[in-house]
């Protein structure tokens, strides 16, 4: 069909730290060179920051480069880290504090800040607009615009006003637009749905290890002022997880008597009975955590997958007409449990390459090889190289053995131990059969520290237009009940942190798979963990999904 179109020099998909940093850098470079570069950022959330969720302890290295005067410009870095506590939780009641000497160097946070990444992105968007970037929130990029020569020429936004069966709704239908560009950057975050399509189309991961993921579940709490320690960073390993189902937690004291509390569970977990949501709820009852939350009030909830494969899992970064940046590429440094500064730097490097190409008079459609070269020469590459073994060591040797390996690698060899560990088993292939794994009896939520899924999703402010096509696509509708249920007790009903998937009984006693798509918080776990790789997440109508205030 013929669509309306707009033309830009650069289109960027996603207003997160990578996309916004790229946009700002492009405009800075244009101003320095006295040239015009038109830049458009599209964002599927209702506003910039609405879909941003991160810990976040923020390392300001890339921000220092992008805006050296960020303090004067009012960047929301309000709480410097004042202390690091790391515990190994041995059981539901006991814990051992790890002496500072034994903590891997990458886990020290002097000079970093506890922030809301959503608020930092809102600030970055203000800077970008001040530099002349056009930002369009509420518009979901549905697919890449690829010409007959296999060159990416921009993106197509999703149609609006389509009913559940895919038919235009009278008086409401608006076809999506083509946003055409000389170069297109994809900054959709972890497991971006167009990024996934591009990796497959251009075979970008042919020389990479399998990507590995975690699911991060997070809450914001208002706590008793007498328990509040602004700047305190607490991390834990161990209980409620184990060597076959690994992960770790965080509890960060920010300003205004608030804490961020969360649990990250590696999606390589093997027990299909495990529920990341319920593991997080019971984790909050541990004395190390409970001491801060008791008497407080939960005010926000959300979840998001993270890419943690690191350097060994990076796909090829470029293709004709564009590039992947940030978590769409997989630049998170798992040894630091930080991805914001690395995402920003990747966006800045890509922007430099595009500015150089446009200044040389190139018309787009080519591969940005100078982005790849600059990446390999940057501190970002050095950081990812030094942390390349971190996740694989935990997968291979468990939390304790992997922790010992990482201590030696990071603290003695500075991340340059003369061996590279590889982990090429994808996360979805790690599940045991339900009959081979122990069942897990989760305690009922008490409504004070622990809660159910529905009341949690309510706090994410998630909303979707109900009469639209379901954005969670099953390649084969029979697989959930006929294969996943007998083999794995259909893990989707547990791995989803928002209650999207249910196995329900029909009147005749048979089972059916129900998808409550309106609950979806866009975490992407189903797209990653489904053992049959039968679920594909695609973008719903723009503005749909969570509306995180300051996650």
Curated annotation (Swiss-Prot):
The scientific name of the source species is Pseudomonas aeruginosa (strain ATCC 15692 / DSM 22644 / CIP 104116 / JCM 14847 / LMG 12228 / 1C / PRS 101 / PAO1)
User: What is the protein's name according to its record?
Assistant: Electron transfer flavoprotein-ubiquinone oxidoreductase
Q: What is this enzyme's EC?
A: 1.5.5.1
Looking up Pfam families in the UniProt record yields:
ETFQO_UQ-bd, Fer4_ETF_QO, NAD_binding_8
Q: Give the top-level enzyme category.
A: oxidoreductase
Reaction(s) catalysed (UniProt annotation): a ubiquinone + reduced [electron-transfer flavoprotein] = a ubiquinol + oxidized [electron-transfer flavoprotein] + H(+)
This entry's Gene Ontology molecular function terms read:
4 iron, 4 sulfur cluster binding; electron-transferring-flavoprotein dehydrogenase activity; metal ion binding
Under PROSITE patterns, the record lists:
4FE4S_FER_2
Q: List UniProt keywords, sorted A-Z.
A: 4Fe-4S, Electron transport, FAD, Flavoprotein, Iron, Iron-sulfur, Metal-binding, Oxidoreductase, Transport, Ubiquinone
Is DNA-binding set as a keyword in this record? no
């Amino acid at each position: 069909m013929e669509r309306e179109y707009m033309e830009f020099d650069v289109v960027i998909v996603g207003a997160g730290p990578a996309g916004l940093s790229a946009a700002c850098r492009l405009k800075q470079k244009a101003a320095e060179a006295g040239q015009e570069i038109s830049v458009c950022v599209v964002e599927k959330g209702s506003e910039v920051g609405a879909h941003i969720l991160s810990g976040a302890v923020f390392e300001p290295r890339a921000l220092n480069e992008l805006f050296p005067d960020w303090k004067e410009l009012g960047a929301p870095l309000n709480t410097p880290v004042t202390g690091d506590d790391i515990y190994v939780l041995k059981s539901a009641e006991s814990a051992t504090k790890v002496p500072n000497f034994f903590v891997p160097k990458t886990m020290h946070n002097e000079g970093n800040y506890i922030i809301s990444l959503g608020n930092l992105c809102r600030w970055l968007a203000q800077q970008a607009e001040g530099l002349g970037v056009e930002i369009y929130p509420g518009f979901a990029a549905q697919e890449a615009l690829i010409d007959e020569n296999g060159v990416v020429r921009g993106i197509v936004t999703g149609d609006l006003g389509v009913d559940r069966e895919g038919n235009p709704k009278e008086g409401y239908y608006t076809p999506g637009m083509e946003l055409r560009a000389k170069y297109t950057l994809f900054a959709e975050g972890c497991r971006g749905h167009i990024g996934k399509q591009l990796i497959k189309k251009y075979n970008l991961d042919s020389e990479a290890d399998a990507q590995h993921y975690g699911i991060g579940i997070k809450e914001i709490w208002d706590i008793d002022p007498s328990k509040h320690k602004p700047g305190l960073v607490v991390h834990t390993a161990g209980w409620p997880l184990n060597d076959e189902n690994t992960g770790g937690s965080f509890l960060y004291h920010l300003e205004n008597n608030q804490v961020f509390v969360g649990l990250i569970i590696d999606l390589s977990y093997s027990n299909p009975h495990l529920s990341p949501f319920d593991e997080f709820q019971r984790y909050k009852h541990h004395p190390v955590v409970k001491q801060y939350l008791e008497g407080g009030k939960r005010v926000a909830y959300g979840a998001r997958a993270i890419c943690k494969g690191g350097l060994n899992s990076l796909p090829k970064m470029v293709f004709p007409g564009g590039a992947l940046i940030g978590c769409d590429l997989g630049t998170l440094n798992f040894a630091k449990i930080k991805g914001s500064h690395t995402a920003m730097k990747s966006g800045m490097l890509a922007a430099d390459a595009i500015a150089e190409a446009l200044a040389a008079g190139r018309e787009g459609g080519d591969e940005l090889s100078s982005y790849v070269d600059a990446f390999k020469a940057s501190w970002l590459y050095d950081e990812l190289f030094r942390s390349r073994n971190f996740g694989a060591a935990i997968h291979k040797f468990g939390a304790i053995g992997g922790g010992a390996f990482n201590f030696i690698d990071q603290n003695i060899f500075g991340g340059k131990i003369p061996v590279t560990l590889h982990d090429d088993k994808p996360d979805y292939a790690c599940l045991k059969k339900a009959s081979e794994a122990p069942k897990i009896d989760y305690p009922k939520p008490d409504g004070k520290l622990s809660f159910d899924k529905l009341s949690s999703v309510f706090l994410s402010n998630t909303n979707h237009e109900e009469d639209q096509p379901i954005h969670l696509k099953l390649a084969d509708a029979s697989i959930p009940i006929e294969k996943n249920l007998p083999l794995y007790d259909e893990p989707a009903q547990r791995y989803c942190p928002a209650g999207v998937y249910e196995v329900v009984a029909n009147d005749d006693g048979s089972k059916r798979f129900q998808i409550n798509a309106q609950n979806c918080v866009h975490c992407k776990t189903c797209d990653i963990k489904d053992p049959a790789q039968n679920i594909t997440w695609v973008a719903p109508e723009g503005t749909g999904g969570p509306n995180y205030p300051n996650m």
